Curated annotation (Swiss-Prot):
The gene is ATHB-52. Residues 8-67 bind DNA. GO terms for molecular function: DNA-binding transcription factor activity; DNA-binding transcription factor activity, RNA polymerase II-specific; transcription cis-regulatory region binding. PANTHER family: HOMEOBOX-LEUCINE ZIPPER PROTEIN, HOMEOBOX-LEUCINE ZIPPER PROTEIN ATHB-52. Pfam families: Homeodomain (PF00046). This is Homeobox-leucine zipper protein ATHB-52.
Length: 156
């Protein structure tokens, strides 16, 4: 007999669709349940106050989980976009490095040097290297105008 009473107390009634609808409506207006509202809802829905309080607590937990999932999806898509942008930029950098190497080799051939131009000489503005830089700029302009440069090349 004692066993059948404890089973009866532990068995919970499911909420009706109307009760759930009213609880949902109230939840959209107030995420936290004030004692007065809890009493009012309890009387209005014919539910124990504790059941109303637990429903709100569970709903807040589900709401937070859903919000975190939405945030996660948003962050994940932003991360994927950033990775895609990074890959495109790396491709552009590689292309520009290759183009610079070709231009330096062309300059080396143009100035009848045996080896490619030393990087440190090209960036210098010393009087000794001014002529070489001017020649490099002219050669690069020629290189670009012949359709080998970035002006006619797509980055895709």
């Amino acid at each position: 007999m004692e066993n059948s009473q404890s089973q009866g107390k532990n068995k919970k009634k499911r909420l009706t669709q109307d009760q759930v609808r009213q609880l949902e409506k109230c939840f959209t207006m107030n995420k936290k349940l004030e004692p007065d509202l809890k009493l009012q809802l309890s009387n209005q829905l014919g539910l124990p106050q504790r059941q109303v309080a637990v429903w709100f607590q569970n709903k807040r937990a589900r709401f937070k989980t859903q919000s975190l999932e939405v945030q996660h999806c948003t962050l994940q898509s932003k991360h994927e976009a950033a990775l895609s942008d990074k890959a495109k930029l790396e491709h552009q950098v590689q292309f520009l490095q290759d183009e610079l190497k070709r231009a330096r080799n062309q300059l080396a051939l143009f100035t009848n040097q045996d080896s490619p131009v030393d990087n440190s000489n090209l960036g210098s503005c010393d009087e000794d290297h001014d002529d070489q830089v001017v020649v490099f700029d002219e050669l690069y302009a020629c290189f670009v105008s012949n359709g080998h440069g970035s002006s006619s090349t797509s980055w895709v």
